[in-house]
């Protein structure tokens, strides 16, 4: 296939013995043809495109030797090296446009440029023989930035102070100059690199070559290429122009002419043979490059490689890309020959006998790598060439240490070759030879040979990051075919010039910062902060030397951003001049006046972070502040940094600080007048150090761009130093302090710094206004908008009829309903929103009268009002947690305190909605939040401990005390001065003096500190001082008028006063709150009229006959008939149902049968013992179809046709099985129901009409068959035919009826047709009404006129529905109803049910209201309709209405003596506690006449707790006064309180005194399971249970140990006091004591507790037991 001889004697395409090409060209004996038929000079088989092969061993596609190139061009053995695109060829070449050029044998650059050419050609073939570079079309052009950079000056306009001004601008980009406007910055940079203008002092002696062919003369010694190789002689430019260097600086030493990329002419020509681009060398590479011998693309032998690199002639082996190897040679990827074979990743090869490529077919079995190099037997390397043996080889980067692993960039290495085949003793990626450690890519030495990646010739010893110079002593191979001749170039060795200020070692960077700064100052490419060097590792991560070099390279072309030159000032509109702000960051920084002179100054201490963690977590001590300003110059950081000055100068901004000005209006008194200054700085919101200073209006009007500090930075540093070292301000307690702390005003430097980082002034925005109504802030909005208000101006005022809404995004809004008139109002200045706060009319002087303008009732919505956790300082936004905390209730309390009306709180958005009557300030203060869900007052008491002031303070400490709050003066009630008397020593005062700090937890109620709102405060406290026997009351918010002098307070370290001593005996008493509904009467009442006339206005006489109505069970009411006569009247409510009792029971049995009961669990709404259980909740399963059928059967059995109709309608509207097409089927069933009901609603005479009107009457009843018969009878065959056809195919007949109507209309005969007949045609044509014009009059006919809603809806369902469902027909019917053409279905139960089925959002309450019968107390139909709708899934009825329905129906059943079913109905109540209360109340009412069997049935059938039934019976048994029965019922009801009372007071004492041990044992057995639940059981009832146990133990002869335990327990309980015990209990205890006495006496173990027994009992004991030997006892009586 590819030209090889086959084993079967023929080629792949049927050729003879000679090889043929891929497309079947015949190959002669001594002539082979390439892909396009060109003859090749050598005989033998051919390669992929016809290349001949001489040796059996070949590459993957057949290695060729001495044959043609990839396209069959013959190649002659030469010593020249061709370039990538065909440079350096002996034969005549043609350019892309056919121009020929001659080339001498020489090596070429990357794109075919010959080195040392005297004549080159342009892209179109024109010859350029002059030393100067050629342009695109051969013309001589100026390349590079030879002209000095001068920024073009132009003009522009901008808005300043509301006016348009013209300013001058400079385009700080070199490509904006007219001389470079046709090139980009990258093109200019490449041209400068080609011309070796990369840094000052390159030393060129002639003009540099441009990008497209400009020639360069020979560089002087010391110049270097891009990657560090110096250029010794002339080279060609990028596209063929002669120059001293290749595009990337590689040196060559020959002087031959080669062609450029697009066919630049070369000097020499030879036999015709074409390359890819038209070059015809004798033998060429892929792109026409000449080589010594022909080679295929993948089978290169001694010719050129894929890119034309020349190799020594070999006989065996070839790599994937045509590299062939001799015994001791191997080629690289691009054909470069190395001394030893190398793998792609640096594996060294031994000298194989025969080599083949990695993909050869039939090659020798020698091991080779993927590119044809044989693998070494004992060597191996890592990805970058690290080997474990000492064999020679090269890595991808040319580094191969003898014994090392990992990445080796330039370490000392043995002889290696680089990634592209160049042989060197050891080098980096670009072929630099290194004999000693070097830079990143390898410092070179003089001993090895090697080339850079792009043909760089290595220089001598020193080497930098990219700028190492080497001196070649042997021929070099470039990466892409440049062959350096073996000649010695004498070069002057000079000091290496760094590319961008970087020398041979990266570690020397810090020593060369002077050079870097000079380059930054003189960089010609403007200012770009994106290219600044970043030294912050937190932002850019780990910076590599490569990235550092790239940044420095770009930075060399940029102007210093922090320069204070005029250019930087002129360009301040691009970058705000933040350098002045950043220059004053830290007080520890001492710098010169010119900040830009020390670019890399590094502060060794971090500036103070006052931003509450907003800065980075760590601070890099090596990070320059100026560099940090570039990367961290966000608005937040600028605010933080500029706030440092504010805190140093003692200034604060009260505008943007939460809780500063906002708290000035609070009713809040801090009775601790003195607070430490450090605590003030930490806690006081007024002196928040993080805040920016207030910016005045004049400063805001200044342009942000041109604002500069008004004070020299050096002076500002000195001023701050003095401010820090000054003494604290004196505290003058004799003058009333301001509402804010008396701090110094904002300094000029601080104001300027703040203005620099502030947002642009408001005047730069074009403010839109309507009649003076405007919004100047972008985050405020209004509804309607300002533009819409322009259309609402009347008489010079904006009149809003539908109200006004003003809001701020993410803060809230205020809505004023009704008519609002505005004029000349800045809405965002009157309505001010802050976090959780709104103020309308912040200036009290500008406030409108109440009820006018915006000082009127409104609805306020504050956003993001969530609870803030005190520990984590995070907002709690979880709805469940907010509910648990009670946040909504807290907001309700705060709303009441503010005098507003709470409306809503939406936890999802934190929206707090309330209504106010007038405006001042409303909101929620930070300290108004509850602590962990506790009420605010409790949180205050828990979080506000007593503040203790130590008396052992110095005068300096007293001076540091700052008064925090304005305190109102007060006068002593007895006008006595508080005298401070001196005492000898402070020890007389004791240790500490507590002073109560009380904070009134009141919300922002908009009130002032007056007495009118005093009653709204919670926990008002008064402080009482006892002075000289008089009591003086100091009201809250006030202070004694005579305040102590400062001198006396300063001497507290040595002495104190009696006033301070009295503080130890401080009495804090709660102030009595006035009653909420106290009657405030006037003076003493006086009799104004006579006694006789006073009877006329006597209220008692007016209501003399009124009496309280008492409701009894079963709905019976009782009232008195006085004063007319002494009678008690009874009345009953008619609760009879429309159905009989059997029907009631049968219907309820259906519900009981299909219902499901489920216990919801214990009630969480009550903790009482009686409410611990709940009744079962009744619900219904989804299988409700059986309910419909049974309801219909019960109604039919009772003869209630109306109920049957309702149940059938519900069954048709809500089918249980909904198969495909169920909607249409439902329409059919509803149509059938409508037919039945329509017949019932029409009189019999109309339905039996046989006249011509009878057709229409039958159509209105839905009977089309009968209408057809009547039409036949009345001689209307056409109508009859069409009616009959419509029953079969309604769609077709619709068009026929319409056509008939159109025909009559055209003939103007519509008015002559009978009305009923015309209605038939209109209806059957699919219309419910029809209109037409005739003789200038409008005529219309309405088919629904005169019909009830059932017939009207039936016409839509029967004839106008087509194949749609019920919803479409109902919608069409509703349109006719709304248009007044049809009767409405509202108010009728079937109509409401149909509406509910078609409109699911319809109210269920409205449907049930229509189910009420004639008797308003009959809820039978309503409740059962509800049960059906509930089972279907309509559960949108409000719980209140639902509960009321259940209670009413239950009362009806109770009045009918159906108590069991009444309980069942009550179990449908959804609320647990309400359901339990209703059921228990009903049980109490029916317990009187209900026997135990009925209760057992109720408990079993409806799962009523037995405890509830027993409790109901217990209430009834109280009237019987049977303690035994009561005790049994109390135990059954688990009424623990009653169990304990009955057992202790009656049951147990009676059994003990009577000696009825069996009854006592039975009672104790009943109580024993509940002993742990009965309160106070151990001190009361356990005496009797222990006594019962003692009797059992004695009777059973138990062990003595058990008896002793019971005796000790019993004796202990007998010592309980007997004050509250009745006589029976005392007697029982004496009886128990007597038994214990007898037992102890028998055991001879009487204790001294016998004193407990009475005298008589003891005498009785002694009398009865005289044989015990009384003489042994000495009994003392008290």
UniProtKB/Swiss-Prot annotation:
Q: Which gene encodes it?
A: npp-10
Q: What does the UniProt entry report for the null mutant?
A: RNAi-mediated knockdown results in embryonic lethality. Two-cell embryos appear to lack nuclei and pronuclei. Also causes severe defects in mitosis. Chromosome condensation is severely impaired during prophase. Centrosome assembly during prophase and prometaphase and their subsequent resolution are impaired which results from impaired nuclear import of hcp-4. Impaired sister chromatin segregation. Loss of nucleoporin npp-5 localization to the nuclear membrane during interphase and to kinetochores during metaphase. Irregular nuclear membrane distribution of nucleoporin npp-13.
Give the EC number(s) under which this enzyme is classified: 3.4.21.-
The biological processes this protein is annotated with in GO are: cell division; embryo development ending in birth or egg hatching; mitotic chromosome centromere condensation; mRNA transport; nuclear pore localization; nucleus organization; P granule organization; post-transcriptional tethering of RNA polymerase II gene DNA at nuclear periphery
What this protein is reported to do is described as:
Nup98 and Nup96 play a role in the bidirectional transport across the nucleoporin complex (NPC). Required for the nuclear import of hcp-4 during mitotic prophase, this step is essential for centrosome assembly and resolution. Regulates nucleoporin npp-5 localization to the nuclear membrane during interphase and to kinetochores during metaphase. Has a role in P granule integrity; may promote the 'liquid phase' of P granules by increasing the number of interacting RNA-protein complexes. Binds nos-2 mRNA, probably indirectly, and promotes its accumulation in P granules.
Leading EC class: hydrolase
In this chain, composition skew of type Low complexity spans 1-11, 23-38, 73-83, 345-366
Task: Describe, as the record does, how this protein assembles with itself and its partners.
Answer: Part of the NPC.
| One Gene Ontology MF term | serine-type peptidase activity
Q: Name one GO cellular component term.
A: nuclear pore
Q: InterPro entries of this UniProt entry?
A: Nucleoporin_FG_rpt, Nucleoporin_S59-like, Nup98_auto-Pept-S59_dom, Nup98_auto-Pept-S59_dom_sf, Nup98_C
SUPFAM superfamilies tied to this protein:
C-terminal autoproteolytic domain of nucleoporin nup98
Q: Where is the composition biased (Gly residues)?
A: 12-22
Keywords, A to Z, come to: Autocatalytic cleavage, Cell cycle, Cell division, Chromosome, Hydrolase, Membrane, Mitosis, mRNA transport, Nuclear pore complex, Nucleus, Protease, Protein transport, RNA-binding, Serine protease, Translocation, Transport
Q: What is this protein called?
A: Nuclear pore complex protein Nup98-Nup96
**Where are the stretches annotated Disordered?**
1-41, 68-100, 301-366, 441-473, 603-631
